[in-house]
């Protein structure tokens, strides 16, 4: 089935998930919406995030997608279940995938969750981690400056390094062996985060596990694209197309992308 896979996020962070889907499923077409005009979602109310997520999902439903991936942890926490109940196609989130990746890797069951305020407040990661291993010690840390840093496109250089180190200061005297990047923007900062927490710590994104989930779901439903299909990805941003283009083309390394402005209602 050669219909596209829909991927949604508050901004450019979901591109980290899209990249893994493209790598794992090279014949699949991605239709991506980044709500860059209203990013970040972390400080917003649950109702606002739910409404915005539904707007993106409905826009992609009209484009006849075969699956939706909510590539945003904050949106997954508040909207996944309602979308799964009401959409005519499978809907995947990123939180369970991130928790699974961490439980597989941690040796000491001491896990840091770096995320937005909204995701931390939701308690969704704690619930997912403890459902997999009740002895997991979880250290949640909201990093509200990280998403605006990535969205600005200025995430390399000395200023970014200082900002990231400052955001991670509360971890200084904590004991942990694994860090979950509980926001899909954060893998773009992964090298800087690894430099702060140390090379002996596992720093994990949910992107790879989410792409694996997508592949398994499509295979189970018999809706994988034909092996000879040439994908035709489309990207939509509610905010600045040039800024989105700069980040997306740099991160995805897919050449010139088809990127358009979209208005959500």
Swiss-Prot record:
Q: What class of enzyme is it?
A: isomerase
InterPro entries given for it?
A: Asp/Glu/hydantoin_racemase (IPR015942), Asp/Glu_race (IPR001920), Asp/Glu_racemase_AS_1 (IPR018187), Asp/Glu_racemase_AS_2 (IPR033134), Glu_race (IPR004391)
Q: What is this protein called?
A: Glutamate racemase
Q: Tell me which HAMAP family the record gives.
A: Glu_racemase
What EC number(s) has UniProt assigned to this enzyme? Answer: 5.1.1.3
Residues at the active site: 72, 183
Q: What gene is this protein translated from?
A: murI
PROSITE patterns reported for this sequence: ASP_GLU_RACEMASE_1, ASP_GLU_RACEMASE_2
